[in-house]
Amino acid sequence: MTGKERREQLLDVGRALFAERGFEGTSVEEIAHKAGVSKPVVYEHFGGKEGLYAVVVDREMRCLLDMVTGALTGGHPRELLEEAAFALLDYIEQDTDGFRILVRDSPVAQSTGTFASLISDIATQVEDILGMEFKQRGFDAKLAPLYAQALVGMVALTGQWWLDAQKPKKAEVVAHLVNLSWNGLSGLEPRPRLIGHRKN
C-alpha cells in the first residue's frame, strides 16, 4: 500500500470510529488496530488523533459547505431557502456519519472545524440574500446577519432532530421549515417591539 493509500485508509477508519464513538471515545490504538497497522503509523501520517480528526472534520465541512453553496445559485429568495434546506437534509441523509462527526463537540484545543463555525460560514452566504431582501422591503440591512444566523440555526437544529426522528419525509420537513421561516419573514416588523414587562 502506498503512503497516500495508507493515509486514506486511516482517514476512512478514523472517520467511521469518530462517527460511532466521537472524538473522546476513539483512541489511536483503536484506529491503528482497525487499520491493521501499528500506532506509530498513525502518528507518522497525522501526528496523533487530533491531526486525523482535524482532516476528517475539514473534509466534512468542505463537503457540506459545497452542497449548500451550490444550492444558492440564484432564483427567488424563497426558492433559495428551499434549496439550502434540501441541501442540508440531503447531506444528512447521504452522509450520516459525516454529519454526526460535525455536530459532536470537537476537542477543546481545536479552534476551527466546529459545527458552529460551519453554520456561521453558511449564514454569511444567506446574509447577502437577506440583505438584498431587507433593502427592497425598507428594513435595516445591518440586521441581516442576525436573521441569517437565526434561519440557518433553525434549519441546522431541525436537521439534527430529523436525523434521529427520520420522519416526516425530507420534502415535508423542508416545506415546514420554509413555511415557518418565509412566512415569518413576510410578517416581519421593520422595528419590532417587546410586549412584555421586561425591556432589557
Regions found by a protein language model. Give the residues of each.
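N-terminal intrinsically disordered/low-complexity leader segments
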Residues: 1-5, 141, 189-200
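Helix-turn-helix
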Residues: 9, 13, 17-51, 55
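Solvent-exposed, amphipathic alpha-helical segments
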Residues: 13-20, 63, 67-71, 154-162
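Short coil/turn segments at alpha/beta junctions that flank glycine-rich nucleotide-binding fingerprints
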Residues: 20-24, 95, 137
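Alpha-helical DNA-contacting segments of helix-turn-helix folds
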Residues: 51-60, 67, 118
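Hydrophobic alpha-helical connector segments
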Residues: 55, 69-94, 148-151, 174
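Amphipathic alpha-helical packing segments from all-alpha helical-bundle domains
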Residues: 62-65, 111-135, 145-150, 172-175, ...
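Amphipathic alpha-helical segments used for helix-helix packing
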Residues: 91-113, 127-131, 157-164
